[in-house]
Amino acid sequence: MAAVALPLLLLLASLVTPTPARDPFAPQLGDTQRCQQRCRQHHPGSPPAQPEPEGPSESPNNKAILISACERGCRLFSICRFVAKSSRPNATETECEAACTEAYVKAAEQRACSEGCWGQIPEPETQLEQKDLALDPPRGRLSLRYLFSMLCSDLMSSAQGFLSSSWTYSLQTDNRKVVVFQTQPVAENFAFQGSHLQRVEVTWRRSHPKALELHMDPVGPLDKVRKAKPRVKTSKAKVESEDQQESDFLSCMSRRSGLPRWVLFCCLFLSILIMLWLSCCTLVTTPGQHLKFQPLTAEQHKGLLVESDWPLYPPLPPPAYEDSTPPYKLKLDLTTL
């Protein structure tokens, strides 16, 4: 009996063991778990939850600070790549190192942060997998509607390229982090440190492609900060058509009317079908416009005859008479009745 109960207990223990929380922004920023694991392997030690940088400089605390700086380097590289929208790892690595230099003062922390930037550089195979996943359309019932919507979006975006909007997402994760994302080249990150909340803002300058600003300012004690609710804000901006996301005609109409995008697409598609059906029905049901000639009677022929000013036929020449002998002259005086 004990031999049977032991495997059952082990199975229940494996089911009860909590699974590690996954970053909800991994599809947008990329998975940083592998980079953070490399940081922990490179700097062995169990780091506490975001220690204070002003604490005593002991060996375990120093290792924890280095691990935190390395993990922050991983996140900074992902944020820089998301903000700059660039697939060149060298340029993103330079921006990440510049952000690490501005974020930390000590050389060891800057070096650890730079190591996090180096560890987050995607491998070629990972990049190919991400491209395949991005290009692969969703499968299932919505695949046909997805193809139609993408076709209409491409057609409408070429005509409505000047309209653009930037989305801002503010979400709170399970590990007490409030992260703010938006499509404009500004990304904000709220990192929890001890009992205080710190705001990290990364700003990308258009005039200087290699200039990346990083600002860190404390928000206040955590007790005074309410639990942030997910909210979405929109703001209008004029940007180039290459940097636009969700700026097509259907998205603009969906934001202005409040209706889902698929409802607008169905209405547009049905209206086109109705117009085609009406045009075809008009061609079929319209009576013929051909003139039918009916034979006329004799009275109708007489009424249609009109005397013309010119002869219908050329004049005939006068008949020619043959020459005859002159008439006889009769003398009436000599005649007797």
UniProtKB/Swiss-Prot annotation:
Family: Belongs to the TMEM59 family.
The gene coding this protein: Tmem59l
Glycosylation sites: 90
Residues annotated as signal peptide: 1-21
Species this chain originates from: Mus musculus
Function field: Modulates the O-glycosylation and complex N-glycosylation steps occurring during the Golgi maturation of APP. Inhibits APP transport to the cell surface and further shedding.
GO cellular component annotations of the record: Golgi membrane
Region (Disordered): 36-62
Biological process (GO), any one: branching involved in ureteric bud morphogenesis
Protein name: Transmembrane protein 59-like
Biased composition (Pro residues): 45-54
